[in-house]
Amino acid sequence: MTVLIAKDLTFEPVVHRYDWTVDEVRELLERPLMDLLWQAQLVHRTANPGYRVQLASLLSVKTGGCQEDCAYCPQSMHNSSDVEGQPDLVVQIQTVLERARAAKDAGADRFCMGWAWREIRDGAQFEAMLAMVSGVRELGLEACVTAGMLTEKQASRLADAGLTAYNHNLDTSPEYYDQIITTRTYQERIETLQKVRSAGITLCCGGIIGMGESTLDRASLLCVLANINPHPESVPINGLVAVEGTPLQDLPAVDPLEMVRMVATARILMPRSRVRLSAGREQLGREAQILCLQAGADSIFYGDSLLTTSNPDVKTDRELLSQAGVHANWEESDE
């Protein structure tokens, strides 16, 4: 299928590209909003017909005490906001699978599990992770894990357990990265993505806006993502949730239209990736969320909490999707 991209209000057939320049991406990102939305709509309708939205539920399995110094994160041991809790491993497995079953019953397609780690380490906790992945897959759900860096062998074992996707965000541009994180390099993130893909696991990789970065930084982040070949299977677009006790606690909320622009540009650059409207969605309001769905978002986190921040409840999201006229799995689950 040919993907159509509009330029100066004319149609121009374009195949998937992996050689974008930052200047090209910035030009897209800064287009007049109506033109940008129109172009994103053309790509979205062509590449992703049916207006179906994937519902992903997210659970924090291991919370707090992370060695990384990510400036936005309340789970970092470097920040005064650090929260921590580690249930017994046996109870943990049972509880996670119960939560996954409840998420499926509510209409979720994918169950995502998060561990606040710098890296995965072999041992009982990794074995528990593998059991959780297998259990989630047996329920008929896609399984996604986010747990920091990993080895090739660990990636292979996760693939054998049935893992659908591994989340490892780039967070921001290579140029701005050191302003946000100093305990892990950008190159280490890229290498983690390569190990995941080599194991046959799909990539979930995106970033965060609203951390003090420039428009050029946002364009640079999107450029890196769009030049991954093939494109990441899913691309979460997050708006900063400024949490007290983190270095970014005093930053203002993201302008909702800036989120719309990021979603629209991501859709144009990566036509068949799932563009996931992620953290910060509560701050957007109904109208901006609907604009994001129009611009190309075809996945949301579903449920009243993310890792450590709040999220719209299920009833609110069902109403939103119905008002927007998009379809999701919960419609079939209620029949």
UniProtKB/Swiss-Prot annotation:
The reaction(s) catalysed by this protein are:
(4R,5S)-dethiobiotin + (sulfur carrier)-SH + 2 reduced [2Fe-2S]-[ferredoxin] + 2 S-adenosyl-L-methionine = (sulfur carrier)-H + biotin + 2 5'-deoxyadenosine + 2 L-methionine + 2 oxidized [2Fe-2S]-[ferredoxin]
* Matching SMART domains: BATS, Elp3
Details of cofactor binding:
Binds 1 [4Fe-4S] cluster. The cluster is coordinated with 3 cysteines and an exchangeable S-adenosyl-L-methionine. Binds 1 [2Fe-2S] cluster. The cluster is coordinated with 3 cysteines and 1 arginine.
- Provide the Radical SAM core domain boundaries: 51-281
Assigned EC number: 2.8.1.6
| Residues the record lists as binding [4Fe-4S] cluster | C66, C70, C73
Pathway membership of this protein? Answer: Cofactor biosynthesis; biotin biosynthesis; biotin from 7,8-diaminononanoate: step 2/2
GO terms for molecular function, please? 2 iron, 2 sulfur cluster binding; 4 iron, 4 sulfur cluster binding; biotin synthase activity; iron ion binding
Any GO BP annotation: biotin biosynthetic process
Keywords attached to this Swiss-Prot or TrEMBL record, sorted alphabetically, are: 2Fe-2S, 4Fe-4S, Biotin biosynthesis, Iron, Iron-sulfur, Metal-binding, S-adenosyl-L-methionine, Transferase
Subunit note: Homodimer.
Which family does the entry's similarity section mention? Belongs to the radical SAM superfamily. Biotin synthase family.
Function, as annotated? Catalyzes the conversion of dethiobiotin (DTB) to biotin by the insertion of a sulfur atom into dethiobiotin via a radical-based mechanism.
Instruction: From the Swiss-Prot or TrEMBL record, give the protein name.
Output: Biotin synthase
Originating species:
Prochlorococcus marinus (strain MIT 9303)
